[in-house]
A protein has these predicted regions:
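Transmembrane beta-barrel architecture of outer-membrane proteins
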Residues: 46, 50, 71, 103, ...
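Residue-level detector of the transmembrane beta-barrel scaffold of outer-membrane proteins
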Residues: 85-87, 115, 147-151, 228-230, ...
Length: 301
């Protein structure tokens, strides 16, 4: 037939949607090692506001909590937090603590995540300090077409209403933000006027202000889909209360028995303000792909 033409080759190119639950299941199924993947779809449906809270839902992962009771460090397969490391988009990041190399995961807002990948087995392509495992935070990528997403939530903790306790605050100006050693160097001799005068004044409130959580992301592709741009931001302003019991134990003189010498039951009023922003640009060229990524995270507690 004159209308028929012989085709030598047909190439069909598709793009995988990594942020869906189906993609997460396929990634785990086809992985060469033991993986757990939390997709963006699952993260958005959960009430978790940071990466540490999201990891609590992953099997084989235990979270170490700080003094206020908030999840902070990941313990993979029962091994201490120093036996695993953290990646952002596949790149190892340093710790904000100058004495340790493990990362507090409660400083990363979950709104910025595209997916969360937890590797529980050491393979040849990993570094030697991944004996426990690896946590890879994959941030949002530019979509195939223009997309804008926004979310906002408001709520309140019933801890203070239910327990009948006041929410305590203080004036930040009453605190000395930096020690003289940090402000003036190790050779400086501290003076009395380098410190604030008087005790910190506590203010009592019937209840804290409402909690607010909000996020916004905008992405699109330009220049014939070769240039991708993704901008995202997140704000989390939360108030909560907690309590802990501390005790000191001593050995009774002349007896093989121990007793509690001091017992303290403390109540905490906590205000956490976490802000985060990230920008990602990618340029696709024939045979190459260039990516530039930057993230800003700040937590004030």
């Amino acid at each position: 037939d004159e209308d028929l033409k012989q085709l030598g080759e047909v190439v069909v190119t598709g793009h995988r949607e990594y942020r869906s639950d189906r993609s997460a299941v396929e990634t785990v199924k086809n992985a060469g090692n033991v993986l757990n993947v939390m997709s963006q779809q699952s993260i958005q449906l959960s009430p978790d506001v940071n990466v540490a809270s999201v990891l609590q839902r992953v099997s084989g992962v235990t979270m170490e909590r700080d003094a206020s009771g908030e999840a902070s460090y990941a313990i993979l397969r029962g091994m201490d937090k120093r036996y695993n490391y953290t990646l952002v988009n596949g790149v190892k990041i340093p710790s904000p603590d100058d004495k340790n190399r493990y990362i507090p995961l409660n400083i990363f807002p979950s709104d910025l995540m595209d997916r969360l990948v937890v590797s529980k087995s050491l393979t040849a392509d990993m570094e030697g300090d991944a004996a426990g495992g690896v946590v890879d935070m994959v941030m949002k990528d530019a979509p195939s077409r223009f997309q804008i997403q926004a979310n906002a939530a408001i709520g309140a903790s019933d801890y203070f209403w239910k327990e009948g306790r006041d929410y305590l605050t203080s004036n930040r100006s009453d605190y000395t933000k930096k020690a003289p050693y940090e402000a003036f160097g190790p050779e400086y001799k501290a003076q009395m006027n380098d410190f604030k005068n008087g005790p910190v004044q506590l203010n009592r409130h019937f209840a804290p202000a409402p909690n607010f959580i909000g996020g916004l992301s905008i992405g699109n592709r330009f220049w014939g889909d070769r240039l991708g741009v993704m901008l995202a931001g997140s704000v989390q302003n939360t108030f909560r209360g907690t309590e802990r019991t501390y005790n000191s134990v001593k050995m009774a003189s002349g007896e093989q028995a121990m007793y509690i010498s001091n017992l303290h039951h403390r109540f905490y009023s906590i205000h956490d303000l976490t802000t985060g922003a990230h920008a990602k640009f990618d340029l696709t060229l024939p045979g190459h792909k260039l990516e530039w990524y930057n993230m800003y995270v700040r937590t004030n507690s």
